[in-house]
Amino acid sequence: ADAIVIGARIIGTAVALALSKAGRKTIGVDRAPKAGYGSTSSSCAIIRVHYSTLEGTAFAFDAYHDWEHWSEYLGPNVLANLEVARFHETGALVMKTEGNGHLKNVVENVRALSIPFEEWGEEQITQRLPGYDLRCFAPAKRMEDPAFGEPGAGRIAEGVFFPTAGYINDPQLASQNIQVAAEAVGC
């Protein structure tokens, strides 16, 4: 083997597939009985393109296109008789807060990479998401705190909407889809 990939979760199976597609003889190993067990199977499967570093943002946006075109990513003849994970592109609204630097760095990153985003004010947030509570609940409180769930001072005034965000319906199944694709190209 040219490479041994340890871990058959979403990252490990994707690495094995990429190496196999590049012509490397690859072996994937995991102590679990199936791909996608472990932390991947318990993840919330959020797909997002907004990160604090330019490199992380670029990597995530590249991966977004794989999720968007899942069958092409997996390769020809992989989908026959196979249940396939689905990407639900819902978009994501991230609030600008003091704690996240009002997303200044994140907005710079997505702007530099021409990733779609919209900056929303309070009026647009409540128009697009009726019933959204814009009271500030920071700082975080432990559940044992009598003030848990009570608003703090101030309001959220702005957010950034990323239309390319969403979620995968089944992260374990997504790992298993990639495993099948990797096996189809010789892993």
Which stretches of residues belong to each language-model region?
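Helical element adjacent to the flavin cofactor pocket in flavoenzyme catalytic cores
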Residues: 150-187
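Conserved dinucleotide-binding and phosphotransfer motif residues
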Residues: 22, 113, 184-185
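Beta1/beta-strand and adjacent pyrophosphate-binding region of the FAD-binding site
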Residues: 1-11, 27
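Gly/Ala-rich phosphate-binding loop of Rossmann-like dinucleotide-binding domains
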Residues: 16, 20, 181
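Short beta-to-alpha linker loops that shape the active-site pocket of alpha/beta-hydrolase fold enzymes
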Residues: 32, 125, 178
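Dinucleotide-binding Rossmann-like beta1-alpha1 core, especially the glycine-rich loop
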Residues: 44-146
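Glycine-rich FAD pyrophosphate-binding loop
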Residues: 20-40
